[in-house]
Design a protein with these regions (language model features):
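Conserved acidic, metal-coordinating active-site core of Asp-based
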Residues: 84, 90-94, 98, 121-123, ...
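Solvent-exposed amphipathic alpha-helical surface segments
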Residues: 30-31, 77, 115, 119, ...
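Asp-based, Mg2+/Mn2+-dependent phosphohydrolase catalytic module
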Residues: 1-5, 110, 127, 132-238
C-alpha cells in the first residue's frame, strides 16, 4: 500500500498551459509589445519545452534556460531581445497570479487528505514535487491554497537538481525518512521528468496523460491514467 503520494504541480495539479497563456499576454501588454496571439504563445511553449528538456538532460543550467527561451522566442517574432532577462523575472511573478486547476485536481487532493486509517491516523502523506522556479512555485502554491493541502513541497531549485535526477528523490527520501520505496508513487504528466525520475528512483509511477500522448520513450510505466478522476478509487493506491 502506498503511503507517500508525490504529485507534480504544473500540468498535473495546475493547468500550466492556461496560466502560461494568460501570463505572457498580460506581460506583452505591460511591456507595450505587439499583440500576443494564441499561436504565438503556442510557439513559445514549444521553445520553452525544448529548453526545459535540455535542463532535464543536464545540457543547460536553469538561469540559461529561463532567459534563453525568451531570447529565442523574441527573435522569432522580431521583438527586442534585450528585455528577455527583465521579462523573465516579471514572468515568474506573473505566473503565480493565475491559478487554473486541472479537472478534478482539488477534489482529488481534498479526498486523499481526508483518508484515514482504522486508528484515525492519516492514510497518505501528500507531497508536491516540481522543477518550476522557486519564486513562481511558492507564489502559485500559496495563491491556490495548495499550501494547506500538501504536507511537503519539494522544489528543484531548493534541492539543487532537477527531476529526473535521482538525487532529487534521494533528498526527498532522506527528509521524509522513507526507507521502503514500495510505499511511494509519483503522479505526473511528464515522461522525461516525472516518470523517468520515478523509474530512476526505483518507485512506482502513474502517468497522467489527458492528451493521449504516445509513450515514445518506451518507459516501463506502472499505470497510465487519462483523467484524475481515475484516481478516485479506494483501491487505486493500495
Amino acid at each position: 500500500m502506498y503511503k507517500y503520494l508525490l504529485f507534480d504541480i504544473d500540468g498535473t495539479i495546475l493547468d500550466f498551459k492556461a496560466a502560461e497563456n494568460l501570463a505572457i499576454k498580460a506581460l506583452f501588454k505591460k511591456y507595450k509589445l505587439i499583440e500576443c496571439t494564441d499561436e504565438m504563445v503556442n510557439d513559445y511553449a514549444k521553445i520553452n519545452d525544448k529548453y526545459w528538456q535540455a535542463l532535464e538532460r543536464g545540457e543547460m543550467t536553469k538561469p540559461e534556460i529561463l532567459v534563453g527561451r525568451f531570447v529565442e522566442f523574441f527573435k522569432s517574432i522580431n521583438v527586442d531581445t534585450s528585455i528577455a532577462s527583465d521579462f523573465n523575472k516579471d514572468y515568474q511573478l506573473e505566473l503565480g497570479e493565475y491559478v487554473v486547476f486541472e479537472d478534478y485536481a482539488i477534489e482529488l487532493l481534498t479526498m486523499l487528505k481526508g483518508k484515514l486509517n482504522e486508528d484515525g491516523s492519516r492514510k497518505y502523506r501528500l507531497l508536491a514535487v516540481t522543477n518550476g522556479t522557486k519564486i513562481a512555485q511558492e507564489k502559485k502554491i500559496k495563491t491556490s491554497g495548495l499550501d494547506k493541502i500538501f504536507d511537503g513541497v519539494y522544489i528543484s531549485e531548493d534541492i539543487g537538481v532537477e527531476k529526473p535526477n535521482v538525487a532529487f528523490f534521494d533528498t526527498l527520501f532522506m527528509e521524509e525518512g522513507i526507507t521502503d520505496k514500495s510505499e511511494v508513487v509519483i503522479i505526473g504528466d511528464s515522461l522525461t521528468s516525472d516518470i523517468l525520475g520515478g523509474i530512476n528512483a526505483g518507485i512506482d509511477t502513474i502517468w497522467y496523460n489527458p492528451h493521449h500522448k504516445e509513450n515514445t520513450n518506451g518507459l516501463a510505466i506502472t499505470k497510465t491514467i487519462f483523467s484524475l478522476r481515475e484516481l478516485d478509487n479506494r483501491r487505486c493506491f493500495e
